[in-house]
Amino acid sequence: MTTARALSDGLAYLLACFNAFCIQAHLTSRFSPAFSKNLATQLPHHNKAIFWWLGVSDETLRYMFVSLNAGLGLLLALPGWRSTGLKVALALLCVGFTSDMKLKEKWLLHFLSHLVLLSITMAAIYVR
């Protein structure tokens, strides 16, 4: 049982690091120029595709994503909140997947990246 818990914790830390990577990519292109550029070019499309009802600017949506990534990364990093963080991650990944599939541009790349993240998250939940 402890091995399964250790695996789940390791996967949760991996997801927390990915959230930190996303924060960095949203705020600066210094360390990941291609990922930053992809996020910046896709953000207005996501705003129109799924977040139109919020009525926020692209810049506001970017900082909302940064806040979500920071909160989720914190939930995943704290042992007492990790189970909750994994469930929140699963829900947010489903929203992101839905948004990417509505865009229909480079859908295979977006599908595969979300499939990998969903697989990691579901594996961490399953072995927990």
From Swiss-Prot:
Annotated EC: 5.-.-.-
Pathway: Mycotoxin biosynthesis
Membrane spanning stretches: 61-81, 107-127
Listed name of the protein: Cyclic ether formation enzyme gkaZ
Function: Cyclic ether formation enzyme; part of the gene cluster that mediates the biosynthesis of GKK1032, fungal natural products containing a macrocyclic para-cyclophane connected to a decahydrofluorene ring system that show potent antitumor activities. Within the pathway, gkaZ functions synergistically with gkaB and gkaX to form the cyclophane. The pathway begins with the PKS-NRPS gkaA which, with the help of the trans-enoyl reductase gkaC, synthesizes the polyketide-tyrosyl acyl thioester product which can be reductively off-loaded by the terminal reductase (R) domain in gkaA.
Positions in coiled-coil regions: none
GO molecular function, one term: isomerase activity
Membrane topology: Multi-pass membrane protein
Keywords: Isomerase, Membrane, Signal, Transmembrane, Transmembrane helix, Virulence
Signal peptide positions on this chain: 1-36
Organism whose genome encodes this protein: Penicillium citrinum
Enzyme category, top tier: isomerase
Disulfide cysteine pairs (residue numbers): none
GO cellular component, one term: membrane
Subcellular location(s) of the protein: Membrane
Annotated family: Belongs to the cyclic ether formation enzyme xenC family.
